[in-house]
Structure formats: C-alpha cells, structure tokens
Amino acid sequence: MTIIIGMTYVILLFILLLSPGISIPITTVWALNITGTQGPDILYGTPADDNIRDHGAEDMIFGLEGKDQISGDRGNDAIHGDVGNDTIRGDGGYDSIFGNDGNDTLSGGFDNDTLTGGSGIDNFNCGRGSNDTVTDYNQVENETKLGNCENF
C-alpha cells in the first residue's frame, strides 16, 4: 500500500515585523496535483485547491480543505471531499463518495456507487447503466439530482 500525503507541500513562511517584540507569521500554501499508483493508495490533499487522481486498486482519498477536483478511476474507492466546493468522480468501481461540507458535485460513474453529499447544496450525477444510491438527498436544501439517480 502506498500513502501519499499532500501535506508535505511547500510552505513559505514570512515574518512581518510590526514593532519591536511583535510579529505576525504569514503562510502561503500551494495546491497540488496528486496522482496515485496502480496499487492501493491512501491519498491526502492540502488546504488549497487540489487535483487528486488515482490510477486503480482500492483506495482511500481525502481532499481536505479547498475546492478540490478528485477522480477515483478504477477500483472500489472511498473518497472524502471535506470542506470546500468539491467535484468528485468515482469513475469505475463500486465507490463510496462523501462530499462533506460545501456545495459539492458528486458523480458515481460506472458500477453501483453510494453518494453522500453532507451539508451544503449538492449536485448528484449517477452513472449511466449503474444503480447508484444517494443517501442524503434533501429537497429542502435545494439539492439537485442529475443523470440517472433513482435510489434515495
């Protein structure tokens, strides 16, 4: 199993001196393009807007904060968006997709997937020819179902 942690990103640390004895640290975080391996992976994003893509096997992906673009590719994946307005695609495999906080777009892709939006106004796109399940669809939150979603 491969663990790829995007939190090993580069941080620029500046110290702004206001007056003697008072300082404020300022940090800058850059988004990452994170690509998994053919084997099972655990992939972590950063607090920035990341692009995370896996290439197969059964993986766990955590976008963390930011407006992330996440693709599970092949394999039965567990994908978590976390805080931010994420776009998450399961693609192939029987995936469990969690948007968590934010206004997310969740797409199951092929096979039978489980889509859970979390808080926020979420869009669900169930895969063509699949039997996806949406576990928290709520019209009161003005959520939108797209595509072939049938199971709520």
Residue locations for each model-derived region?
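Glycine-centered beta-turn/loop sites at beta-strand termini
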Residues: 36, 45, 54-55, 63, ...
